[in-house]
């Protein structure tokens, strides 16, 4: 007979839980939040310094060279090299993520993608499988995931920009998984140093790389702390940060694993 364990153990310091659900917003940030809520995306300028761009490019190249032909890292990016870690709580981005999702946030996934010359257009897709209602549930729940892309190469018509359909995060149906152009799509030509954040439920896709060079991106995605994460939050680098990092870093790395 199965023996029930009635003990409930909290194995984290409850001080890492924010005292307020939502941060105070100034007029500029409030305007950005309203834009994101309406259109489902936001372009953040000066999200990375020149030195950070150089460091990321060097680290990205070194990491994928070791992977020998692999073009995707789907999760646990921070475990591949500690030089990726500053993206975890990068201030210009976290400021906007908290403004939109509230203070109780964690990483949904930390990934990277190398699109080599000859890669094809992606089909249109959403990143989440949950159904959508723009009004949420009566209590206010809504599947909330925000993707943040740091593009390490200037996006052009040749190497493949990002295509989105602004406002489609509110659509009640998924997009057709096909390669075609929406009449109201928007093409984003991201620049190194910018961060492109977008709702995981917006219709989006990466276009094919017709250039002679690789296209490189790091993707750090966020959600509320009470949602399931793709990350394992294990491994030596993450374990060290969960032990000795800041309260925000611990929160972002899933330290509040039960309540």
Each predicted region: which residue ranges?
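Active-site rim elements
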Residues: 81-84, 183-184, 205-207
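A structural signal for short, well-ordered beta-strand segments
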Residues: 109-112, 148-150, 218-222
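Short hydrophobic-aromatic micro-motifs
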Residues: 43-44, 148, 196-198
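Catalytic core of non-heme Fe(II) oxygenases with the double-stranded beta-helix
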Residues: 119-190, 227-234
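Non-heme Fe(II)/2-oxoglutarate
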Residues: 2-21, 195, 202, 207-259
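Short, conserved beta-strand/loop elements in beta-sheet-dominated catalytic cores
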Residues: 186-201
